[in-house]
Amino acid sequence: VMRVPFTSGILIGIGETRRERIESLLALRASHRRHGHIQEIIVQNFKAKPDTNMAGAPEPELNELLWTIAIARIIFGSDMSIQAPPNLSPGVLPQIVNAGINDWGGVSPLTPDYVNPEAPWPHLDKLARETRVAGKFLEQRLTLYPRYVQDYPRWLDAGLHSQLLSMVDGV
């Protein structure tokens, strides 16, 4: 049986408590420990959108985003990729990296953020600069993480393995 690695995460700032965030992250960790299927955890801050029921809702403060990223890193450890969308927190990207993310996610110079089209992706050069400020570097990757390519019998059709292997750095 082929399995599907995927992304999961939590949306913060919608009325939940810190305890509820921890409980949600612990539930995701328990699921991942059972199935090994979560490639990355996204910690996404709520952004109010016009013409929605939550248009007037307050957005979470930066310290709440940073706290939640740090807790996610503690809960999942260094083996899990932790993401936060860079287009939703302009001007504080080094702080987000320092809180514990190691991946910006699907940033694209070609397509908009379909979930938050009002918040354009940062230019890749700017994102690379701000990532360097935090002592890290920006690197392009496939949507499938190297560890899943390495364990291809479990996660991939065998016919795709050699092609993907040639595209994955460090495998």
Question: Model-found features: residue ranges?
Answer:
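A generic short-segment signal for beta-strand/edge and adjacent turn/coil regions
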Residues: 10-13, 73-75
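Auxiliary Fe-S-binding modules of radical SAM enzymes
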Residues: 22-171
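Glycine-rich beta-alpha junction loops
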Residues: 12-15, 45-47
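Radical SAM/AdoMet-radical enzyme domain recognition
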Residues: 1-8
